[in-house]
Amino acid sequence: MSSPQLTYYDMGAGVLAFSTMRQGGNSMGNYADFNINNYCGDAPEHIARNRQALAALIGVSEQHIVMPHQTHGTVVCRVDAPPAEVLEGVDAVMTDVKGLCIGVSTADCIPILLYDAEHHAACAVHAGWRGTVQRIVQEAVKQMQTAYCSQPCQLKAVIGPGISLESFEVGDEVYQQFADAGFDMDPIARRYAKWHLDLPQCNRIQLEAVGVRDVWMSDICTYQQYEQYFSARRLGINSGRIYTAIVLK
């Protein structure tokens, strides 16, 4: 078995930040090769071996790999120790504890990592279109301010692999939800045969609106690069998930 392949992000010397790719694991079919998500139908024995491989690669114990069960809401959970049970209904996790690997699962939705170097705190955010329209990334920044005294102007943000404007076709009702929520649609929407939305850009705009200036965009479209990164629109819901995570050193 080859080692898991990761896309790394340079967020500073104090952290390890990455997204998993599809290569280098034990899973099969639409989960091939590397999936560690328990909630998408993959074989438990494959997930277990993949988690072991990831833990060994990044230098943490398996118990320190934190992955919530996401429900497209806006709940941000502070994690101070390895959870004793599933983090149910959580779409963002934050910590200031060294050695905890906090992350979110995506397969077209937008993963966002936040890092506060001054207070050595981090957050991982899952922003699908429902979370984006509810401004979950702004809620995450707010929660980091409350928990760790993080200043938005000092945060670093990475917007990881997700579906691009060119590939994210939506119905009129989804477009209207964004318009009704007060978004300026010109920078984030384009009309082809149907409306297309730019979720990465929408989350970047939200971050900048609350004072986060250091935002790095991966510009990886999961739909177009589905051979390297999982895409539910390409592969179906019963397929693997990307794990985008950050570990405080």
Language model features with spans:
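Active-site microenvironment for binding and transforming phosphate-containing groups
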Residues: 1-249
